[in-house]
Every structure is written in structure tokens, then in C-alpha cells.
Amino acid sequence: MLTQKTKDIVKATAPVLAQHGYAIIQHFYKRMFQAHPELKNIFNMAHQERGEQQQALARAVYAYAANIENPESLSAVLKDIAHKHASLGVRPEQYPIVGEHLLASIKEVLGDAATDEIISAWAQAYGNLADILAGMESELYERSEERAGGWAGWRRFIVREKNPESDVITSFVLEPADGGPVADFEPGQYTSVAVQVPKLGYQQIRQYSLSDSPNGRSYRISVKREDGGLGTPGYVSSLLHDEINVGDELKLAAPYGNFYIDVSATTPIVLISGGVGLTPMVSMLKKALQTPPRKVVFVHGARNSAVHAMRDRLKEASRTYPDFKLFIFYDEPLPTDIEGRDYDFAGLVDVEKVKDSILLDDADYYICGPVPFMRMQHDKLLGLGITEARIHYEVFGPDLFAE
């Protein structure tokens, strides 16, 4: 339990840390990786190079400090972090390592301004946060291991199918190498895939949505190729596209994530996606259309038909289920793409153009796609009168969505 004095010191110094936050976090990662290079196996090094992980951690530290009197207000954020950590295999013994280098970085960047009293207060605050997260993650590991077909840590899977979905998205159907069943998951959850990157000399982990409904035998992930070279974003996705084939092995974590629909509800849902953001939506859609039927509206944006994954199966579903409406936006339609046949609207996704179809009583709204896309859709939904509590979103990688 933190004393009031500790809370007061943390709150009073939070603005100073926010001002120097990026420099502190940059210093922290450099310091920690020099002392513990094995942690590069957990962290996304592409996000490191772009500075996104540094920004996200700096923002998280400040948010925790600013809300230290009312940590319950961060419960949803902490839950998301715990799910992400569980998917990465973060262990309790790694928290002291992070704490040691974070506190040392605060001292080394701020110098004499970071007094012993300030460092002590932040050490207590960090310890409290670490205990909360480690406890949440322990529960997630136990739950994953105890359920039928579940496991904790990494499990070897065999690629049984590799199917191109578009020019840039490929689906992989994966079955356990041990021949056992796989755990069910909530529609919208993700798994982590761990691959060894020989040229880097360490493992890299990426999260991919499970893009099919649970079947107890296999998982399907749909991966967008993010073109890039060594050490840049997209290296892992390119490796999966180019080097992983049927019969090869991949290591998977159990399903995690808080972005999913309530399968017991019958109220309407509106799915809004951009690009590869449709992958969790497809899983949600398949489950929602099962008995009892519920109203579903799917609004999707892509550049054109060449990169529009799973187009035919979505169109088929819209013809089959009377309670399902599909709206497609192409912002760069090909000459062969015909409005009214291949897509409904030219341009970027604009929910105002379909507001008569998406403004439904008691509906929940799910957004997935690039961060700027999600921010735009989120703000437009608020402008249409949708409450914040009804809007849900998924961010893979550092969460740069919330300001």
C-alpha cells in the first residue's frame, strides 16, 4: 500500500517526468538492452527503431502517475497491458529488471533534480504497478493452462494451409504439433507468433488476430505483408510470407486480448475496419451470425479489390443473412472495380455516409485498423452521438491511440 506522501511526490513530479519522458525512456531501453540483450527476444525491435515503444511507455508511466490516487480508472488499460504481456510470455522476475533500469534512467537523465526521496517514491510506485500486473498475468496464465486445449508459454504448431487472401494478405491454418486440441477463444482475440530471425540473432514476436471462429482443432491467422528490410517494420511479416510454408513449424502463445464481442448478447454490433483490421472482425462476424441471429453492420475500407482480403466470403455472407449489412469503401479503386458491384463508396471510410444503417439502438461499435483510421472513426462516432462506452478498438503494438 502506497503512503499518501509517496503518492503526493509521484503526482508532483509526474509533469517533470512527462517533460523529459521520451529522453528517459530512450535512455532506459538502451541501458536495459546493453545489460540484458536477451530481452530483445520479447520486445518489438521495429517499434524500437521508430520510437513508438518509447512514446507508449512514457505515456503509460505518466498516466499511472497522474491517476495514482484512483488506479481503478486505469483498470481497462492495465487489463489490456496484462493480456499483451501474457501473450509475450512476460514473467514476474522480469519486472525488477525493468524497474532497476527505469529508475536508474530517471536519475541519470534528471541528475540532481531526481533526489533520493523522489527515486524512492517512484520505486515504490513502480513496485506497486508491477505487483498489480504480475498478479493479473498470473491469473491469465493459469486460466489459459487450465481450460480444455489450453497451455501457458509457447506451443509448437504445424502450418497445414497457406492461402493467399489478396495481393498483400495471406492466411495460415495452424494445428498443434502434439496432435492435441486447441482452446476456444473469444471472437476478436489474438495469438502471438514467435519466429527466430537469423540475421538479427534473436527471436521476434508479433500478434495476429485469429481470423476464424473456434473449432477446437486449429487456428487461422491472416498476415499482411508490411514491406521492409532488416531491422525495419515488416521484417517478420515478410518472413512469414516468403519463408514459412506448409509443413513448417511456428511457436504460438494461447489466445489473449480484450477486444471481442459478447457472444451471449443479442444487441446489434457495428464492425468498422481498415485494411488488415478486418481479421478480428471476420471472427466476430462468424460468431455473431450464428444462432440466435443478431443485427450486424460491417463497414470496411481498402485501397481496391487487389488488396481487399476475404471479399468473396463477406459478400456471400451479406447475401445469405438478412440481418447482415456490408458496406465497402475503396479509396483507390482499380479501373476494373465497379461501384455498386465491387464496392459501395469511393474514398476513405466515412461513417456519416452510412449513418442511417449504423445508428442502431443499444449497438456496440468495434474499430480495428491503422491508428489514424481508428482515431478518425472514433471521433466521427462520438460526433454522431455514440457514447464512449459503446466504442471498442484494438491496437497491435504500442498504443498511440489515446492522447
Curated annotation (Swiss-Prot):
For the Globin domain, which residue ranges apply? 1-138
The record's catalysed reaction(s) read: 2 nitric oxide + NADPH + 2 O2 = 2 nitrate + NADP(+) + H(+); 2 nitric oxide + NADH + 2 O2 = 2 nitrate + NAD(+) + H(+)
Q: How is the cofactor bound?
A: Binds 1 heme b (iron(II)-protoporphyrin IX) group per subunit.
> Taxonomically, which superkingdom?
Bacteria
Q: Where is this site: Involved in heme-bound ligand stabilization and O-O bond activation?
A: 29
Which cofactor(s) does the record list?
heme b; FAD
Instruction: Supply the domain comment.
Output: Consists of two distinct domains; an N-terminal heme-containing oxygen-binding domain and a C-terminal reductase domain with binding sites for FAD and NAD(P)H.
Q: Name one Pfam family in it.
A: Globin
UniProt keyword Phosphoprotein, yes or no: no
Question: Which region ranges are annotated with the description Reductase?
Answer: 149-403
Q: Which residues bind NADP(+)?
A: 275-280
- Where along this sequence does the record place binding of FAD? 190, 206-209, 395-398
Gene that this polypeptide is encoded by:
hmp
One Gene Ontology term of the molecular function aspect: metal ion binding
What are the catalytic residues?
Answer: 95 (charge relay system), 137 (charge relay system)
InterPro entries in alphabetical order = Cbr1-like_FAD-bd_dom, FAD-bd_FR_type, Flavoprot_Pyr_Nucl_cyt_Rdtase, FNR_nucleotide-bd, Globin, Globin-like_sf, Globin/Proto, Hmp
Task: Look up the EC number in the record and give it.
Answer: 1.14.12.17
Annotated family: Belongs to the globin family. Two-domain flavohemoproteins subfamily.
Q: Share an example GO biological-process annotation for this protein.
A: response to toxic substance
PANTHER family hit by this protein? FLAVOHEMOPROTEIN
This one is known as Flavohemoprotein
